[in-house]
């Protein structure tokens, strides 16, 4: 959420070599934490189940500086308190605007990057999952697809990905937050041009992250529709069909209670409305092969406390029952319609400003039952073997693959900006051995992302055309 009207103007920082940030990445990792664990090849359903219940470090790194909106410096003790209460995920919203230089490198300030990593380490030290995003970045204008914006998205995400490429899969990347700058009908899906621009930027970001290699080759990446609104989920254009992508929405439901402080909640009709909305959201996304991260939700200090407790319990329970992860928006504000705060961060040691609401979240999550249909979701190993000449691909290279059963086959090649430069489709092939040549025309030397699909199986590889 945008909870502050602080200036979003883009500051220009001294240029620091991108390579330096990449080299610093491995040194960020806290020794002995789950950040050092091996990648586990979890299905999306298992990953979301493990995330369980989440908490936002709101109005902190998403401000112009960590303390710029009146927050204290984040400490290990704060995150320890969150973990002790039963939360297993920390979402770390980050504003990068004002912390990187100009084109063409858009180099991120190394001190800011190091602080983002240090806070992530606090959660990883407690074996928590961490989501890192780009927040309050309204310069990603969606009125049309801009090559300049796309290049900026690629540069920023390449640097973030390089800084965290050695981290385990406990770290996930959320491409944006509530992307809507320049969009029409922001909470109803936007226009065709808006959706095309967002899909292009997210596709470019995914390709850039995957191209950095290391653990980023299979890291979970989270995308969202315009404004991250669940109302327009059916209009969401899913970027590259990558098996390690999920969808985030922000569900302040019902709006009158959750955002406006309308007072009471808890009738049978209230409960039925939440179930209906979650069922519609999850069912549609399931048809796209995605699972859901409820990246922001909550209720406020303006609401009556008994209703807040009921709502917190029920919503946390039902999100898990429907196969999602509920992540509470905590902005460290404790009064009025903007009072989503739960943890009093300035207290030493940190304490819960609304302990009964925090406990309701924990109890609600504990009572939830994650759908077994998502737990048994499998990402089968690719049986369609691809020969890529040890990772180097020449223009005349033959792609060899085996189909264990009849299916359609497609091969797409993306440049590092996320633009499709080649799209080959073979329909209804019988079981057997095949080969496909990458066409030389229109493809120059350089790095690309190759996406190979056979039936429901995907493989995505970084390749180099000589």
What are the residue ranges of the model-derived segments?
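Bacterial N-terminal signal peptides
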Residues: 17-27
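Short, acidic/polar
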Residues: 67-83, 153, 274-281, 312
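An active-site-proximal structural segment forming one wall of the substrate-binding cleft
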Residues: 72-74, 78-88, 107-135, 142-175, ...
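Acidic/histidine-rich helix-loop elements
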Residues: 57-74, 98-108, 256-274
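Active-site region of glycoside hydrolase catalytic domains
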Residues: 151-263, 277-300, 321-324
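N-terminal carbohydrate-binding accessory modules
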Residues: 30-91
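C-terminal outer-membrane/trafficking sorting elements
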Residues: 377-466
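Substrate-binding cleft of secreted/luminal carbohydrate-active enzymes
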Residues: 275-355
């Amino acid at each position: 959420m945008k909870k502050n009207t602080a200036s979003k103007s883009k500051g220009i920082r001294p240029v620091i070599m991108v390579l330096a940030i990449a080299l610093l990445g491995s040194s960020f990792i806290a020794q002995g934490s789950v950040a050092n664990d091996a990648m586990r090849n979890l299905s999306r359903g298992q990953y979301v189940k493990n995330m369980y219940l989440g908490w936002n470090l709101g109005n902190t790194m998403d401000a112009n500086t960590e303390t710029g909106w009146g927050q204290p410096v984040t400490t290990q003790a704060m995150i320890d308190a969150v973990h002790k209460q039963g939360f297993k995920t920390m979402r770390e919203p980050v504003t990068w605007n004002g912390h990187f230089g100009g084109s063409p490198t858009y180099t991120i300030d190394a001190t800011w990057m190091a602080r983002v990593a240090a806070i992530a380490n606090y959660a990883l030290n407690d074996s928590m999952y961490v989501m890192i995003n780009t927040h309050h970045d309204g310069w990603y204008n969606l009125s049309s697809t801009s090559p300049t914006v796309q290049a900026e998205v690629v540069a920023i995400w390449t640097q973030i990905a390089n800084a965290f490429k050695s981290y385990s899969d406990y770290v996930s990347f959320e491409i944006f937050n509530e992307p809507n700058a320049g969009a029409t009908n922001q909470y109803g899906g936007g226009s065709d041009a808006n959706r095309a621009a967002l899909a292009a930027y997210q596709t470019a970001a995914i390709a850039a992250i995957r191209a950095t290699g290391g653990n980023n080759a299979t890291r979970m990446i989270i995308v969202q529709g315009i404004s991250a609104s669940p109302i327009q989920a059916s209009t969401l254009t899913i970027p590259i069909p990558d098996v390690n992508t999920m969808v985030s929405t922000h569900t302040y439901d019902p709006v009158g209670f959750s955002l406006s402080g309308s007072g009471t909640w808890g009738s049978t009709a209230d409960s039925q409305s939440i179930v209906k909305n979650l069922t519609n959201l999850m069912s549609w996304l399931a048809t796209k092969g995605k699972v859901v991260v409820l990246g922001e939700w909550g209720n406020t200090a303006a609401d009556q406390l008994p209703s807040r407790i009921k709502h917190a319990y029920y919503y946390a329970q039902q999100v898990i029952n429907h196969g999602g992860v509920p992540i509470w928006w905590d902005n460290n504000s404790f009064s009025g319609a903007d009072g989503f705060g739960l943890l009093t961060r300035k207290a030493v040691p940190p304490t819960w400003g609304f302990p009964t609401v925090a406990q309701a979240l924990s109890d609600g999550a504990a009572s939830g039952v994650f759908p077994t249909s998502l737990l048994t979701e499998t990402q089968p190993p690719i049986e369609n073997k691809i020969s890529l000449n040890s990772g180097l691909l020449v223009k005349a290279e033959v792609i060899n693959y085996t189909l264990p059963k009849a299916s359609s086959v497609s091969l797409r090649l993306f440049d590092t900006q996320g633009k499709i430069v080649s799209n080959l489709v073979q329909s209804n092939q019988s079981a057997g051995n095949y080969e496909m040549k990458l066409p030389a025309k229109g493809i120059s030397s350089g790095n690309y992302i190759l996406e190979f699909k056979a039936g429901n199986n995907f493989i995505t590889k970084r390749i180099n055309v000589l």
